[in-house]
From Swiss-Prot:
Quaternary state and interactors: Homodimer.
Gene name linked to the record: phnX
Protein name as annotated: Phosphonoacetaldehyde hydrolase
Residues reported to bind Mg(2+): D10, A12, D184
Cofactor binding: number and manner: Binds 1 Mg(2+) ion per subunit.
Keyword Oxidoreductase carried by entry: no
Molecular functions per Gene Ontology: magnesium ion binding; phosphoglycolate phosphatase activity; phosphonoacetaldehyde hydrolase activity
Annotated organism of origin: Bacteroides fragilis (strain ATCC 25285 / DSM 2151 / CCUG 4856 / JCM 11019 / LMG 10263 / NCTC 9343 / Onslow / VPI 2553 / EN-2)
Entry EC number(s): 3.11.1.1
Length: 263
């Protein structure tokens, strides 16, 4: 009888850092350091990609590209990308520890699944050096994974599937049908689709919702439901197998997937 053997979790916006805020401020400050203005919506759009690729995507946006040309009288180059990445890393490392609190519900949910024998892997848009900060902080707060793959040591990060493949190899999981990838960005969903695993989006606490926990609780019920529905649609349009409101719904979803695997 086939059943789900492995959950692969994203990090910021899925497991820790409610609303995925750590990278946002660092990107905005980095671009400001080069005299360029980007807003929160632009900053969040490529979220989930490797951070250096995220910078390329921001520079490619027509309004940002135009700003760059107007300011520097030339097209941007890979040297500019590297310079922006250095600035981004400087600002991110200065605040990263503050953004490692596990999202409510994550620890009990994942521990319940682990107790049932599931392996817990993870992928991220953060580099290994960034995860060297995040992993011990999250673990000290009660959240741990069995493996963490980072994009900088592989042929490509998201939306390519290599980080998932590395998890499957390291955790000895041979069948992608028995794997659920959980994430909060469009890049997360695409990563799962490309790896041919069950790709699940989670809405509350996500980059796509772009709200703090306090802002989420303060929203009128009807507006909250509308926002959740919008995010769900975006995730399904990107190819999500399922979308759940919060991580607490994951065990029930796994039961549903298990029943489908055996019909």
């Amino acid at each position: 009888m086939k059943k789900i053997e492995c959950i692969i979790m994203d990090w910021a916006g899925t497991a820790v850092d409610y609303g995925c805020f750590a990278p946002v401020a660092a990107f905005i400050k980095a671009f400001a350091g080069k005299g360029l203005t980007i807003d929160v919506e632009q900053t969040r759009k490529p979220m989930g990609l490797p951070k250096i690729q995220h910078i390329r995507e921001l520079l490619t946006m027509p309004e940002v590209n135009e700003q760059f040309i107007n300011r520097y009288r030339r097209a941007w180059t890979e040297e500019d990308v590297v310079e922006l990445n250095h600035l981004f890393e400087k600002y991110l490392f200065a605040s990263l520890k503050e953004y490692t609190d596990p999202i409510p519900g994550v620890i009990p949910t994942l521990e319940k699944l682990r107790a049932e024998g599931l392996k817990i892997g993870s992928t991220t848009g953060y580099t290994r050096e960034m995860m060297d900060v995040v992993l011990p902080e999250a673990q000290a707060k009660g959240y741990r994974v069995d493996y963490c793959a980072t994009p900088n040591l592989l042929p490509a990060g998201r939306p390519a599937p290599y980080m998932i493949f590395e998890n499957l190899t390291k955790l000895a999981v041979p069948d992608p049908d028995t794997v659920v990838k959980v994430g909060d960005t469009i890049a997360d969903i695409q990563e799962g689709v490309h790896a041919k695993v069950w790709s699940v989006g989670v809405v509350l606490g996500s980059n796509e919702m772009a709200l703090t926990e306090e802002e989420t609780h303060a929203l009128p019920a009807a507006e909250l439901e509308n926002r959740i529905a919008e995010v769900k649609q975006r995730m399904l349009a990107a190819g999500a197998s399922y979308v759940i409101r919060s991580i607490e719904e994951l065990p029930a979803l796994i039961q549903l997937i298990n029943s489908k695997l055996n019909h």
